């Protein structure tokens, strides 16, 4: 029976976990892009994600990344995102945490000091980081093109009734639930209620509607529900609680969710290029967002968003997936 060893550095980005896999039994992935490599990972190696993210080695909110060499030598690295919800096309909080870990631990030598160009399954992202001594104090990501995919869709939600939502893409597809007669705002509910409702809503929306990236059909399906509400701090623009996986609410403001919400606000005329979008999480942590440019995606209006936040390292792991362990591939209790 085989054992597979993985060397990981654990961090959190504004409260949400990031487990960066730095070495060990990292599989070779075929493909000319991180999108193609993601497909290979999903076909043959998703057991690694489950083993490292699910219990007993992980938990309901666990999220992480695996570092790879870039497919284009002009870039600094490739990143594959793994979490309880799947192998994601893009993860904003994960990128901030990965960059922090990579720079502080000397895992990547940047071609340009202060900048990392990262290949991710959703495309190419640029990360600019600030340092004080050996510490990375902030990371700003210029994300992939984001857009409002659908407006005023309806879905029946348990307990709440019929809800109207917009769906936007910021690296993943998000159903955005704004305050309305049947939902006055996230501040009126407990996290466990939002989680239970969101799980049913996501299933129903994927049954009722189809969501496919216009240029990359491997990016498809609604994966996240973004509940909105009144900010805690007067300096915040907006607040959200993002549901992912089967039992998780993002403790960070969610990078791809922030990108999706800025795309929604842009389409509604509520946010203009250059304006700051201070996005607050369920625990009050902050991402500073901004529209860097207006653009198009498959002839649809879109934006190039940026998100800035911080991360901290808090541990080192040598994790073992032992085939003699009945829970080698993890489990969830739902």
From Swiss-Prot:
Catalytic residues as annotated in Swiss-Prot or TrEMBL: 91, 254
Keyword list, A-Z: Isomerase
What residue ranges carry the coiled-coil annotation? none
Q: Which reaction does it catalyse?
A: trans-4-hydroxy-L-proline = cis-4-hydroxy-D-proline
- Mind telling me which Pfam families this protein's record contains? Pro_racemase
Q: What is its EC number?
A: 5.1.1.8
Q: Where does substrate bind?
A: 92-93, 224, 250, 255-256
State whether keyword Isomerase applies: yes
Q: Which Gene3D superfamilies match?
A: Diaminopimelate Epimerase, Chain A, domain 1
GO molecular-function term, one example from the UniProt record: 4-hydroxyproline epimerase activity
> This protein's superkingdom?
Bacteria
Record-linked InterPro entries: Pro_racemase_fam
> In UniProt terms, what function does this protein have?
Catalyzes the epimerization of trans-4-hydroxy-L-proline (t4LHyp) to cis-4-hydroxy-D-proline (c4DHyp). Is likely involved in a degradation pathway that converts t4LHyp to alpha-ketoglutarate. Displays no proline racemase activity.
Give the record's family classification.
Belongs to the proline racemase family.
Q: What is this protein called?
A: 4-hydroxyproline 2-epimerase
Tell me what organism the protein belongs to.
Spirosoma linguale (strain ATCC 33905 / DSM 74 / LMG 10896 / Claus 1)
What does the organism's lineage look like at the top?
A: Bacteria, Pseudomonadati, Bacteroidota, Cytophagia, Cytophagales
């Amino acid at each position: 029976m085989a054992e597979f060893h993985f060397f990981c550095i654990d961090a959190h980005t504004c409260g949400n976990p990031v487990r960066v896999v730095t070495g060990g039994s990292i599989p070779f992935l075929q493909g000319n892009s991180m999108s193609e490599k993601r497909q290979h990972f999903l076909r043959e190696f998703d057991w690694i994600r489950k083993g490292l993210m699910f219990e007993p080695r992980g938990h309901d909110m666990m999220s992480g990344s695996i570092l790879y060499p870039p497919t284009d030598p002009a870039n600094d690295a490739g990143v594959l995102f793994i979490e309880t919800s799947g192998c994601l096309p893009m993860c904003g909080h994960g990128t901030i945490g990965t960059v922090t870990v990579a720079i502080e631990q000397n895992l990547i030598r940047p071609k340009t000091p202060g900048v990392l160009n990262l290949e991710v399954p959703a495309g190419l992202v640029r990360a600019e980081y600030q340092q004080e001594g050996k510490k990375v104090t902030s990371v700003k990501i210029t994300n992939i093109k984001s857009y409002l995919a659908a407006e005023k869709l309806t879905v029946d939600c348990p307990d709440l009734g019929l809800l109207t939502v917009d769906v936007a893409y910021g690296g993943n597809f998000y159903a955005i639930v704004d305050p309305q007669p049947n939902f006055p705002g996230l501040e009126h509910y407990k996290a466990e209620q939002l989680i239970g409702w969101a799980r049913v809503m996501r299933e129903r929306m994927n049954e009722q509607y189809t969501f496919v990236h216009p240029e990359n059909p491997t990016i498809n399906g609604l994966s996240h529900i973004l509940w909105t509400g009144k900010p805690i701090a007067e300096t915040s623009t907006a607040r959200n609680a993002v549901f992912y996986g089967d039992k998780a609410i993002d403790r960070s403001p969610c990078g791809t969710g922030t990108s999706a919400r800025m795309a929604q606000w842009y389409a509604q005329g509520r946010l203009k290029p250059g304006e700051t979008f201070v996005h607050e999480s369920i625990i009050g942590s902050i991402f500073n967002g901004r529209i860097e440019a207006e653009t198009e995606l498959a002839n649809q209006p879109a934006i190039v968003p940026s998100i800035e936040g911080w991360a901290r390292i808090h541990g080192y792991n040598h994790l073992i997936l032992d085939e003699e362990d009945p829970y080698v591939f993890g489990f969830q209790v739902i």
